[in-house]
Design a protein with these regions (language model features):
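Entry/capping segment at the start of metal-dependent catalytic domains
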Residues: 4-110
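Extracytoplasmic
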Residues: 61-64, 96-101, 110-113, 118, ...
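C-terminal solvent-exposed extensions
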Residues: 49, 76-81, 267, 271-336
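Flexible, polar/acidic helix-loop-strand segments at domain edges
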Residues: 173-255, 336
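Extracytoplasmic/secreted envelope proteins and their assembly/folding machinery
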Residues: 98-100, 115, 131, 142-150, ...
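Second-shell loop/turn segments in exported
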Residues: 89-93, 131-139, 154-159, 225-234, ...
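Amphipathic, coiled-coil-like alpha-helical scaffolding segments used for oligomerization/assembly
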Residues: 134-198, 284-287
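Soluble non-cytosolic domains of exported or imported proteins
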Residues: 94-98, 128-129, 136-144, 162-166, ...
């Protein structure tokens, strides 16, 4: 491991390979688990984005859609942290950008929850700003991101939950690390991920963030480093692997000791931003399927393209069925 980061701890018992058919990023979903038992005092400490009040869709029918955003921002980051240089950027206001965007579709009547990750390179029409990557919409404010998704993809968004990377690391630290298995030696020289030997390890908060953010993921096999050419799409899959492990650990800890739930919430609450209309206690009823493990992942069909000299992703031929399901106008499509 790099000397600037505490090393991952080798686990004595090898875990089975983690199933990839799970849900998005850990910092958002662990916050959702925490909301299930949120207290009034903790709710008062949550930041409210007032600009979202006029753009969120009214809830209709038995389902609710939550936009879950993981933001890459230096606003709450510690300048002395070993990964500070990789968070945000010096040429953006506040070094702020969306790193992960997902939609959680919860049907309280059926007791089911579904997740869809939106690639940040998805080419969309940003109202008032023209066409660009989805990631660019967030730089104009969370209300523009919400408006973009609703108008470009036709999916009503009822609520907004955003957590930054400081909160991510706090949650992983509160969990005591997260267990992840690697089939080969693995690295990402851009994020600092460094796993020199295959096996299962408990990743600390720094290596966990490096793993979850990795877009230039390499494995060492057949005497050479082999890069994962899927970039953002590969990163989405790895985030889902990481999340399953983190959720499992959080559920185990909070089941054995309910006080751990409050500790996990406190680890995230100061870096949590939600829409003005979100009642955390009311939302708990809709988010219970996360805690019970009943979450199904639906991949969004996309294909690479070159537009305005930019490498982007555009919707694929099979995207319509998934978008219609999340919009509430059709039933769930089959998962391949």
């Amino acid at each position: 491991m790099s000397s600037s980061r505490p090393p991952a701890r080798r686990r004595r018992k090898i875990l089975p390979q983690i199933n990839t058919l799970t849900v998005g990023v850990v910092f958002v979903a662990l916050t959702a688990i925490g909301l299930v038992v949120a207290t009034k005092q903790q709710e008062a400490n949550v930041n409210r984005a007032d600009a979202l009040g006029g753009v969120m869709a009214d809830k209709s029918g038995p389902f609710a859609n939550y936009l879950l955003v993981g933001s890459d921002t230096r606003e709450t980051a510690d300048p002395n942290s070993p990964d500070y240089g990789g968070i945000g950027s010096t040429n953006e206001a506040g070094g702020r950008r969306s790193d992960t965007v997902m939609i959680l579709h919860v049907d309280n009547e059926l007791g089911t929850a579904s997740m869809m990750s939106l690639p940040r390179d998805l080419w969309v029409d940003i109202p008032g700003f023209g066409k660009d990557r989805l990631n660019s919409a967030y730089s104009h404010g969370p209300e523009v991101l919400v408006d973009t998704i609703q108008t470009s993809l036709g999916i009503p968004l009822n609520h907004y939950i955003e957590v930054d990377f400081t909160s991510f690391k706090n949650i992983v630290s509160a969990l005591g690390g997260v267990d992840v298995c690697f089939e080969y030696p693995t690295r990402d020289i851009n994020t600092g991920l460094n796993v020199p030997t295959p096996g299962c390890f408990t990743l600390d908060q720094y290596q966990s963030l490096a793993y979850a953010r990795s877009r230039y993921y390499e494995v060492f096999r057949e005497d050479a480093w082999d890069v994962d050419g899927r970039a953002d799409l590969g990163r989405i899959e790895r985030q889902q692997i990481f999340l399953q492990a983190a959720i499992s650990k959080a559920i185990q800890q909070t089941t054995a000791n309910p006080m751990r739930t409050s500790e996990l919430i406190n680890a995230a609450v100061n870096s949590l931003t939600v829409d003005p209309g979100l009642n955390l206690l009311e939302a708990a009823d809709y988010l219970r399927p996360l805690a019970s493990g009943g979450v199904k992942r639906y991949p969004l069909s996309v294909v690479p393209d070159m537009i305005d000299d930019k490498e982007v992703l555009v919707l694929g031929a099979e995207a319509g069925a998934v978008l219609a399901y999340f919009a509430g106008t059709a039933g769930p499509p089959p998962v391949g």
